[in-house]
UniProtKB/Swiss-Prot annotation:
Name under which the protein is recorded: Cellulose-complementing protein
Pfam family, one: CBP_CCPA
Gene: ccpAX
Residue stretches of biased makeup (Polar residues): 196-226, 278-304
Chain intervals with Pro residues compositional bias: 80-91, 165-175
Chain residue ranges for the region called Disordered: 1-21, 75-94, 117-337
Entries under InterPro entries matching the protein: CcpAX
Extent of Low complexity compositional bias: 117-132, 142-164
Amino acid sequence: MSASGSDEVAGGGQAGSPQDFQRVLRSFGVEGGQYSYRPFVDRSFDVTGVPEAVERHFDQAEHDTAVEEQVTPAPQIAVAPPPPPVVPDPPAIVTETAPPPPVVVSAPVTYEPPAAAVPAEPPVQEAPVQAAPVPPAPVPPIAEQAPPAAPDPASVPYANVAAAPVPPDPAPVTPAPQARVTGPNTRMVEPFSRPQVRTVQEGATPSRVPSRSMNAFPRTSASSISERPVDRGVADEWSPVPKARLSPRERPRPGDLSFFFQGMRDTRDEKKFFPVASTRSVRSNVSRMTSMTKTDTNSSQASRPGSPVASPDGSPTMAEVFMTLGGRATELLSPRPSLREALLRRRENEEES
């Protein structure tokens, strides 16, 4: 394996990456993809040339500081010359003189040509009409331009030329100008009639008229394309990803209450296969302390020392306790049956019989 970065620095070579990953992997036991555990203490991390490394570190720091000190005065010298070239101020004054030209250009030159182009022909007829609408300020400008536009198609020959291509266009376009011509005095229709006259003048492109009608009625266009309401099921069939056959309205309903009681598990089946031992409380005429200190005289097994009496509540009997403890320390509590006791019991039994 190649030497680590720290080893190269100690040997006098150039320092590699700040951390040698190969050595780290080798020390932690991950080399070769085999996750073999090794202690996290790696002796190769011990620094050997402490004084040299420290001296070099400080020398490098001093060199860096010295270079910084040398570099900092240089910018100060370079900053000194820039103050003289303060000439950029005159250009700022020139920019201030720039506003006057925009003022000259801002004259309403662009708005004049359209206004002059439309009412250039009717000014002769405007003389009688101008007298009435002069008092109202906002409405007259629209009313002055529109009424002349209505009589133009009938009187001016240019309107007749424009009316010729109208028949090939769709039928709804032709009756609209006729209805507006019949009612020139109604000012409410004027703003709607003026743009249609302009569309007729634009004229030679019949494709624009149906496009505008389509945009005006998006509902009609959508119905003409589909010819039926969009079906969600049909739209799902187009998708390549298989989806559930149930529509959103036909969602399956939960068959039982488990849908609402998610946290509660049904343990009926579990109780069948995994019965739990239930503790039963048995009440006997002998208390626990009495059963540990005395023998039960009512039972026939009490006279037999070899067969221990099973306690009714499941607690360990004295014999079991003695067997567990070893029997030596319990001789004083329960003395072993001696030969004398055996003879006395035998005599009693003979007398009873």
